[in-house]
Amino acid sequence: MDGHGCSSSQAMCRGAFGNVATRPAPFPRSAAPFVVAGESLGALRDKCHAYFYDSFSSFTGVDCCYGSRFDILLGSYFNTITLSHFLETGLSIACICVKFPELKYAEDGIVQFVVANPMIARSDCEVPSRPSYTYVTKKWSRTTLTSSLSICGPALELLTGDALDGTEIANFSRARAMNQLARDLKLTLDSFERGTVHHVLGILIRKAPPMPLLQPLMAAMARERDMNVVARANILSAMKNAVREHLFFMDKESRGDPQDIARGLLSLINCTLPSVSDTRVTHVGPGGRPIDGVLVTTEAVKGLVTQALTLTASEATVPAMYGELSISGTNLVTALLMGKAIRNFNEAARNLLNFADGNVDVSDFPDIPQDGEDAPRTMSVNMSLVTVGDSLVAVEALERIYARTGVPYPLAGNVDLTFFFPLGLFKPHKDRYAIGGLILPDTAEAAVDGRLFPPTEMFFFDKDEQLRSVSFESSLGTVAHPIAHGIMETLQELSQEQWVQARPPAPMDFTIQRMSQQPPRAQMVEFLTAVATAVTAPHPSATLINRRSTDQFLSHTNPFLQLEVHPFYDVYRVAQDLQTPSDAALFAPVEPSTLAASRRLCNGDIPLPLSSADFRSSRGRQLAACGAMLSSQAAAAIETTLSDPNYPVAFYVIEACLHGDETLFLESQRLVAQCIESYWVSAGGLAFVNSFAMIMYITHNLSSLVNRNCHALYAEIVAVLNSMRAAVSRFTQSGDALLQHTQEELNHLLMDPAVFPPILYDCDPIIRVTGAYAARNITIRTLGERAPVVSTRDWPPQADFGAINITLNHGPPYTARGRADGGAHHDSEWTVLNKIFYYALLPALARGRCCSVGVEFEMVYNLINTTRLPANADDLAAPEANPLHVNNLAPDSFNALLHNSGVALVDAEALVAFIAAARLRQVAHTLPLRVSYSADPGFATIDSPNTAFTDGVLYNGLIMMNYPQYDATLVASRYFYALPVNGFYANRTIVEATHRGAVNLGEVPEDLPLVPTFLGAEAYRSIRAPSYMYCAKQCASGTASAGAVAYGLMAGYFKTSPVALTHQLKSGLHPGFALTVARQDRFYADQILFARRLSESYYMGAPTTESRAENNSLMIDIHQPRSHVDMGLGFTASRMPAKLNTVVTDMGSRSQNLFDARYPGQFRYLEVADFIASEITDDDSLAMPRARPPLMLPYEAPPLPPCLERGQRATCEFLITPVTADLKYFYGPANPRGRSSCVACMPHEDPSRDSVDRAMYDHTTPDAAFPSRATNNPWASQRFSLGDRMYNARRGFIVTSDFFSPLGKFMTPSRVEDKNRCLARLLRESATAVSSVTGNTEFQFVAPVGSNELITDPCAIFQEAYPILCASDKALFASYENPRKAVGTGARENHFAQYLIHDASPLSGVLKCNGKL
């Protein structure tokens, strides 16, 4: 380079032609026409070979003029061919092409426009307008196009003749070298043609905002509205609708009226504004009609447009020259390079290659235009012209320019869309109707229809119209992963939140009172006194939570919503100084509260607002579908008994004296049978139906002593119990025992040996767990916080009622099997049925009307001792010996109690046998037991708390159904006192009646559960308030039968551990929660771009060449500076993906397996890890290898399939969602996490991290998209919730890319913030550009940064996913019609519990599967 910034060849050129600058006849300042490229190439090959190749001798230093000749030749040739082809393309319509030879010297360029603002003449009393002008200054953008040519050393030697030896081979090689050089030169120079097109197309794309952004903005600005929050929100809403409506609009409309395509193109055209040069006419169609712009797209879209709209013309008249902007140009070299003196390339080559130094004259160029020949020159070219509305536009496809170049066509690219749909949601009762309009009553148990049950599968179509499905089993890789079952890290983070201290902890949530040495009645009175004297009612949090409706719970005003962060844990406030057990009945915290978590062992512990009573009953019907249900006769008889306010107290006395002992029952069976017969005849009820042991003994032993019809009802109860037991086996996969637990014990809570029945009369459960499950830490405490002593010896001859004895008299085994089982009286199935009766069947029948009570056995035995009996056996047959004879009805005697109870069939023999047996095995006290244990091994992960669960049990207690408050002859509280063991048996009336003399409960709220804290706390019970309140609520409402509720409770007792979920989901049982399924698909789309005419000023500088030696070869670089300036007073171009080219992904049902995609966490037991591995991967050790070290499952890439047939496999990810989530939330675009996170329309123009965090996580404010609630899924939308922990990349668990983790972009705050900033910047900058044309910015009216994402990944920038066409029952597809074409024609969406969701995505109407099947 010389000092002037020129190359050596240019410097030599100035020296060689120095005398040209002094010529008296300078070249005229006019533009030159051009010729077709084919003629130029012909001239190059046919006429100029010798002269052309001789020029290369300059590189050997023979003649410096050869270098100048070569530079001039290359520059002239390249000018001609580049611009001639560019002017023939439709892109030239959008450009003002100007030659500016001095562009390489100009670093900055400024263009100023003066725009006259329109005026309107005003009428009287109005201020008239005055002329005003807007001065617009714009800077140009400058770049340089470069292409290279290389000539190797051997070729140079051949061309210069140095390597010629006179042989024919040498001459042939030289000819080949010449031909190869000509081909290389052609390719090199042709690259400028393609480069010009690529450069201009890139400029137009950068200045063309997507139509979904531009159209709403233009509409808003047309109304001259301020860009306040409301206006931005309206624009944002319109943008979302525009994306759904206009994306792939040609596919949507091509099946209908072609005019629909015209309307889509018209929308694209109308959202742009004319340029300031619009008055100039450079390109015209037939009849001199100006061409308004150009549509640039792909060949496929061009064909559709021309076919649908019909060609208006196939030729256009375009400029044959380019404008001129020159600073100086008086020498021949500059003139030649500018093209001022060139009519065609043939003449240029002929003259350039024949001139000698100093003898160049103007006469050598006969086609030089003379003065006055400045009129614009035009030429006719082939161009497709169509009429869209009132506009004549050219349709251009430029794919041929990019063919085999390795550069992708800019108007064909990928579009990523994220779809979502629900799995397992349960519709409200009012929405469950039949297609024909007939409603099937829920109580019609005989009508077994699977469509009544909660859905467990979702069907949809893939890209090839194949029906696919996703079931709960598909989600095992997510819901059975350890990361979904840990909470310790979440607790640490949540405890730091300020709102933790905003509300005091509820003592009944966590207080476990120490059992004193006092009798149980006195301890119960102490507890009731503490409750009654509390300043504020000590409601457990669970009561306040579960009495809310779903809408109330999800409201931003719910103070408990922030604690509901995990479906498998109860998070509660607890005192930091908590002592367990506590000396106080209600622990009064002194230090600030913190948070703790307790595992929900079963899905029935999920709060009612998130797992409704209606859903539980429906799932119960699923369990009962193949099982036994109580007949109407049995249900009526039981209901008669449970609702009888005069149920004989004598029956409670008899039941207490027998205390579940089978030997006593057999000895007293005559009296029991007489009581049953009497009550059946007098009231039509079933006596002793409140006791499992009595029902079993009656069924097995009294078939010949009791009325046949009556006995059949007892047998029916037992059959239902066995059927409920069989339901557990039906939904449990077969398998070996795991850590001493059978698969059923790991799957169902009532099968768990650590869970005891609430009423015990023997020590069978205690004997089985003693020393058998060391890892479970099973402990039992009774009075004095001591462990009870199990006695298997004979009963003591006399009970000591005055001393508190903690010995549990089990007695010696009386069967061979019992002796073989270590002393147990019954097998384990007896205990299981016992638990099913007390935890499922009886609560469903009782509806909260029962209460567990302790027995004052001393008073009971004193009562039966008052029985008047014959003095000897000979008098038993005498009429006066009848216990109900008037002579025997002494006041306060047992005879009078039987008589007043209506027991008319009792005889003396039965009474004698009963009293004699009862005296042999007397019980001193009812002992309350508090059983503590850890969860089974299937729950254990390193991130789960080791909670000690506690359940209350009454040893030798009973269940009272109705307190005889209307019987004035008896004070039942002398014999029985309320001692609730759990919420199923805590009837308020009975509690008040039995303790009325000791404590006044009149001020205690009716809904406050009075379960004493010395029997456990709500947060530590295995069965919690949701199950209690469901039972009372559903039965009281009458919307479900008692049988459905009983099975519903059984369904709610299935566990939530990874092992249990494996059984349930593989067996087809609804797990008690729903899922939000998200999938991201990729589509290859053809875009269409519209640019107004003359919307860009395009400057071309003089080309230069540089040569250099490199590695024994010659490198020749050709440069040409370019610059461009936007000529618009608004956005003059817009674009939109118009046609779906290819579906890249398969749109299938492949499910994410977090064991392969995430850090897998740890199980505490190797056996559990192996079981999960074998069940989830079907023993495919390559997919999830056995863990070593034994507690961890390390990440390894999953095996790849041998091939792909339907495209790249899309991945479905799962978010656990409440079953009561609003189904309508999934009818339209929404955020999969359940709460909107789009803050682009906040009062602050630039969203900050705080504003994004508040929108995402502050649930004390309503959801911006759904203001009626704070969230639709608290388990995913809240900070540190399960969904946040699983898919928030900031937590460090995501190790896959965004594409394979479609939820990552919705769950990660940093990504959400970036997208919100991008969207806010789009709105702000676009609105500023549209509303104002003043300024001095380089990129004015250029599409804002990020606008491309509107059409490449709209889900990320809007933070919304789209619903797809799916249904929970594939039969619903049979009557489905596309709502776009079947509005009002009866498009059905519901059938009982099943539902269909319409496609509300941009693909609606694009794929065949979205239309009518």
From Swiss-Prot:
This is Major capsid protein. Pfam families: Herpes_MCP (PF03122). The keyword Repeat does not apply. It is found in: Virion; Host nucleus. InterPro entries: Herpes_MCP, Herpes_MCP_upper_sf. SUPFAM superfamilies: Major capsid protein VP5. Keywords: Capsid protein, Host nucleus, T=16 icosahedral capsid protein, Virion. Self-assembles to form an icosahedral capsid with a T=16 symmetry, about 200 nm in diameter, and consisting of 150 hexons and 12 pentons (total of 162 capsomers). Hexons form the edges and faces of the capsid and are each composed of six MCP molecules. In contrast, one penton is found at each of the 12 vertices. Eleven of the pentons are MCP pentamers, while the last vertex is occupied by the portal complex. Homomultimer. Makes the hexons and eleven out of twelve pentons. Interacts with triplex proteins 1/TRX1 and 2/TRX2; adjacent capsomers are linked together in groups of three by triplexes, heterotrimeric complexes composed of one molecule of TRX1 and two molecules of TRX2. Interacts with scaffold protein; this interaction allows efficient MCP transport to the host nucleus. Interacts with capsid vertex component 2/CVC2. Interacts with the small capsomere-interacting protein/SCP. Belongs to the herpesviridae major capsid protein family.
